[in-house]
Amino acid sequence: MAPAYDFKIWRENNVLIAIICGSWSKLSAQDFANEFKQAAAPLTGQPWAHIVYMDDWNLGVPEIEPVVQELVTWCINNNLRYAAQVHCPNMVKRYQMDRMVIEKSDGFERRIFPEQQAAFAWLASLGFHTKHTNFSHQAG
C-alpha cells in the first residue's frame, strides 16, 4: 500500500523547493526532515531560501510539530533567510504551520502566498532566483 503522504524536494540555484501532499504522521515528517537536510546541505555555507507548495497537504498529527520545529531551527542555524509557503487560505493549515514555523526573527522571514507566482517573485526580489517560476514542471 502506498503511503498516505508524499513529497518532492529539489534545488534550483540557492533555493530549496518542495511540494508536500497528503496527511502526515511523525514518521512522514521525519522522512521529510531527513531528505530536506540532505538536499539543503550544499546550500548551508551561504544564505539560501526555501519555497514549499502545500495546497495538497492535509495537515499532520500533533507529533509532527517537534520534528518540524527542529528542522526549522536547523535551517535557520544553517543560513536559511527566507521561506515562502504557498497554499490557498486555510485557517487550520495556517494554525498548524504557525505552531511549527516562526514568522520572523533576526535574519529570517516567512511569508504565506495564495499564488505560487507571487511567492517566486518575492524570493527573486530578494536575490533568490530559480529556473522556474511555478511548480507545474515537477507536479504529478
Outline where the language-model segments fall.
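Amphipathic, Lys/Arg-enriched alpha-helical "gate/interface" segment within cytosolic domains
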Residues: 1-140
